From Swiss-Prot:
Induction: Expression is increased in low copper conditions, probably through the transcription regulation by the copper regulon transcription factor MAC1.
Biological processes annotated in GO: ascospore wall assembly; carbohydrate metabolic process; chitin metabolic process; fungal-type cell wall organization
UniProt cross-references to Pfam families, sorted A to Z: Glyco_hydro_16
Compartments where found: Spore wall
Function: Spore specific glycosidase involved in spore wall assembly during sporulation. May be involved in copper import.
Main location: other
Organism: Saccharomyces cerevisiae (strain ATCC 204508 / S288c)
Record protein name field: Probable glycosidase CRR1
Active site: 217 (nucleophile), 221 (proton donor)
């Protein structure tokens, strides 16, 4: 369910003072294509709330923001790059690994929220993970360029690195709204693979999804009260259709056992894999909506997200609580008693973008601006994509995209937007 990541995770994990008060209004302002953000808080987040600063980076929804230049261009992951996290001492990095489109085939107590540089934040930074409120928020172009080279993921909430394994731990201490990691770059078609163990207990939800700034999404989700099953769904342009959700067996306890989950997405189909076996396939041709005369199929650049969130929170609506399996027992659940928190553990992440119709355009842009016949991985780190928002209410697809190179999409400070920072 899309509410999982879009409405809960971003508000967690502030200590000392409320970071959110500095880049969001005191009283929340909702945004939509019919009700865009005001000039003073110009950027609409993926959670349909207006703000500035880090809200204008990555997942900023141009359709619901103040104007077309409020959101910063989105850092892109393009063919010949590969984003990877591994739990060994190896440092993750972009790797040359061009792949054409493939054919269809058959603990010791809770951590503090990580908003200050310290031991936990330093460990995350060493794994190329940075707090989302810091990423690309700087007036210094050189510092922003270095962030693009140095960091592959952002985090919020109670994220840490497990000392014994090097795994990413996504934690949800008692009465909090969990943790989230997000890739710093978005890609248009490719394969995303995550090897992980999910959180357990009634009402606790673990999610791995691909999501775009304007509401395209492909999901895996796991309910903590049903550890033998995974759920899948997909959405287009923010149109939530829960009838498309399908469940399938995993084969072994998802909390006790590491499994590899993959989403393979191209212009014609989506395939969900569990441990190398196809669990579900959706063909674009089967998503045609005769009423809107559109394909309800994800076809805009998406970033990877992994989260733990409280579907069974008493603050949620009854539909969400029932879907999640009921209210969370914040006092007597085994992991709360033993560790003070629910946790999911991520051992490996790999994102490999496929070649798409814009690949040659991107390469031409780099060569033309460099005035050279070749390009480097560093050159690719400054490729960006944005949306041509001529009409807020129009359906967006590949034709809505604008690609550019040698662009550093920084935001000067927590009160700025892309327009104010250029």
């Amino acid at each position: 369910m899309r509410i999982s990541i879009l409405q809960l995770v971003p508000v967690v994990g502030y200590i000392g003072f409320a970071l959110g008060e500095l880049y969001k209004p005191k009283n929340s302002i909702s945004c939509s294509p019919n009700n865009p953000c005001p000039a003073e808080w110009p950027c609409c987040s993926p959670y349909n709330e207006c703000g500035a600063g880090p809200i204008c980076v990555g997942g900023c929804n141009v359709r619901s923001s103040f104007d077309e230049e409020s959101c910063a261009p989105i850092p892109a992951l393009v063919a010949s790059q590969k984003l990877e996290f591994v739990s060994t001492p190896k440092v993750p990095k972009f790797i040359v690994n061009y792949q054409p489109k493939p054919p269809i085939r058959e603990g010791n107590g809770p951590n503090k929220a990580n908003t200050k540089v310290g031991v936990v934040e330093g460990e995350l930074n060493s794994k190329r993970i940075i707090h989302y409120a810091k990423f690309l928020v700087t007036p210094d172009s050189k510092e922003a360029e270095k962030m693009l080279e140095d960091f592959d993921f952002t985090h919020s909430g109670y994220t840490s690195i497990e000392a014994s394994s090097g795994n990413i731990v996504l934690a949800m201490p008692k009465k909090t709204t969990g943790s989230l990691i997000t890739s710093t770059r978005s890609f248009l078609y490719g394969k995303a693979s995550v090897r992980m163990k999910t959180a357990r207990s009634r009402g606790v939800v673990t999610a791995f999804d691909l999501t775009s700034a304007i509401g395209d999404e492909i999901d895996f989700e796991w309910l903590g009260g049903d550890l033998m099953t995974a759920q899948s769904n997909y959405y287009s342009q923010g149109h939530l259709d829960y009838t498309r959700m399908q469940r399938f067996p995993v084969g072994a306890d998802t909390w006790a056992t590491y499994h590899t989950y993959e989403i393979d997405w191209d212009p014609d189909r989506i395939i969900w894999y569990v441990d190398g076996k196809i669990a579900r396939t959706v063909l674009k041709k089967d998503t045609w909506d005769p009423i809107s005369k559109e394909y309800r199929y994800p076809q805009t650049p998406m970033r990877l997200e992994i989260a733990v969130w409280p579907g069974g929170s008493e603050t949620n609506g009854p539909g969400t609580i029932n879907w999640a399996g009921g209210l969370i027992d914040w006092e007597n659940s085994p992991d709360i008693i033993e560790k003070g928190q629910f946790t999911a553990h991520v051992e490996q992440i790999t994102v490999t973008p496929y070649q798409n119709k814009f690949t040659e355009q991107v390469q031409f842009c780099i060569k033309a601006k460099k005035k050279a016949p070749t390009f480097s991985q560093k050159d690719l780190s400054r490729v960006v994509v944005s949306y041509n928002r001529q009409d807020r209410l129009n359906h967006h697809d590949e034709g809505s995209l604008k690609w550019d190179c040698f662009v550093t999409p920084k935001i000067n400070d927590w009160l700025s937007s892309w327009k104010r920072s250029k």
